Amino acid sequence: MRSTGYLLTLSAAFQVAQAAVTANNSQLLTWWHNTGEINTQTPVADGNVRQSGLYSVKVQTTPASSSLYYDSFVYLAIPGNGMSDQLQYTQGYNQTQAWTSFLYSHDATVKISRNGSSANSNVVIRPTSLNFPVRYDNQSVYITVPYSPTGYRFSVEFDDDLISLAPSGARQPENALLIFASPFENSSTKPQPGSPNSIAPAPGRVLGLNTTSASTVVFNPGVYYFTGHDHMVLSSSVTWVYFAPGAYVKGAVEFLSTASEVKASGHGVLSGEQYVWYADPDEGYQKASGANNNGLRMWRGTLGNSSQTFVLNGVTVSAPPFNSMDWSGNSLDLITCRVDDYKQVGAFYGQTDGLEMYPGTILQDVFYHTDDDGLKMYYSNVTARNIVMWKESVAPVVEFGWTPRNTENVLFDNVDVIHQAYANAGNNPGIFGAVNNYLYAPDGLSSNHSTGNSNMTVRNITWSNFRAEGSSSALFRINPIQNLDNISIKNVSIESFEPLSINTTESWMPVWYDLNNGKQITVTDFSIEGFTVGNTTITASNAASVGRIDGVDPAYAGSVHYID
């Protein structure tokens, strides 16, 4: 339960003035915002940053040359971003999500205090596989974070802050705290200071980036905003946007360049907090009047007639108003992505997906908070690894449905699903999922099993080393709207299942048919290896009773193989 002092502190919006001590040396970089605003009720001022009134975080490298811990600003995202009329489009659990980020080159100790509360509550760090050393004193929790060249992204959860979400019974923090420890930036992700081809807008309202002749836009530390009726449309000359550590930009990015590479990098924040849900630029950034899929993306680009790579490194995105990313143009076969150390937080609105992974994409070392499709498997030759995912109440962790496709050679590996909270079958639950053809089932759900394409195949797919902590939905719910061949589910663990009564945990794969000729869709070589529920390994003999894999149609059951 929150302390009375905390409730009183948060009952009014006010600006915090604090003499913070931050680090800026070769071992550690932390940052602060002097315009932090503690406010959980309304939108914050344009030039302010919503700050946690509960958590205080300080960081020290180890071994330390002194006893000094350096302040690290704790950001906060809330459902609806303080816009009361937008709460109807959020997940409805009234949770908040705080986070802090720092750069480091040595092992570090993170000191966490709760304002108005003692530290006399055990914490769990998720993913639990990290096994970071934790110690306590009367006021704070101390977590040792070893240095890693790929960083760490994790959740710190106090036992006395956990709430039970109905009807799944999932135990989740009411006031989440995420820690993002990242390696220092290098010349490939940080522009040279004073480059003649760069422009650095002044903090405040940003204008004119659609007409600049610069190739690089640099957001230095400070607070920037585009308002809820504008976004960052970049001129065709701009190929790089850099968000410095300590930069906080309220807006969304749209590239018009058709260059061979466009890039967004840096360890600042891009926040969609000023936008309403499903903000449609063609309708004055108000909620779209229909399901036109034209909601504002946090990342958008336009292709020309040649190939392009979108490089995304280090940035934290908060409060996306809709799907996170889309490119458009002559052929999406021309776009690929390289994504590293990316974080998405505060995705409380519905339809807040993970990133698109276009052909050839490599995505790694990512934290996702999503309330729709997580890892979107729509294209070939894609690798995604080292993902931490906090799944809200809609759509599976991996989605590869909506329309028949030819997709091959995909590897998703080392994925920690630290939370799920599905309510019913209509949420499209599951670790691995493929919903129905959207042309005939707009919400992905339909009893029509004749919407497939027998001339298309998803093949040579490996989903390996997935770990679902806490209560989980089904291993898979797959509507095979095209043929499936050589699908490998390997080393997946589920700690426990959600209640059987809410119809989210049984795996199924019903028989499917071609839309035009009635031909049966085929499934060949579908293997499940090293799947565990709790401490039990799932085999053919206990797949239905323990693994809850009891909905595979007899037409496909002979192609599903279990390997201990």
From Swiss-Prot:
Q: Please give the Gene Ontology molecular function terms for this protein.
A: isopullulanase activity
Q: What does the entry's PTM section describe? A: N-glycosylated.
A single Gene Ontology CC term: extracellular region
Q: What is its main location?
A: secreted
Q: According to the record, which residues are glycosylated?
A: 24, 94, 115, 138, 186, 210, 305, 381, 448, 455, 460, 486, 491, 503, 535
Catalytic activity reads: Hydrolysis of pullulan to isopanose (6-alpha-maltosylglucose)
Location within or outside the cell: Secreted
Tell me the enzyme class.
hydrolase
Q: Which UniProt keywords apply?
A: Glycoprotein, Glycosidase, Hydrolase, Secreted, Signal
EC number(s) stated in the UniProt entry for this protein: 3.2.1.57
Q: Where is the signal peptide?
A: 1-19
Q: Pfam families from the xrefs?
A: B_solenoid_dext, Glyco_hydro_49, Glyco_hydro_49N, IPU_b_solenoid
State what this protein does: Hydrolyzes pullulan, a linear polymer which is composed of maltotriose units with alpha-1,6 glucosidic linkages, to produce isopanose (Glca1-4Glca1-6Glc).
Q: What is this protein called?
A: Isopullulanase
Q: Which organism is it from?
A: Aspergillus niger
Gene name tied to this protein: ipuA
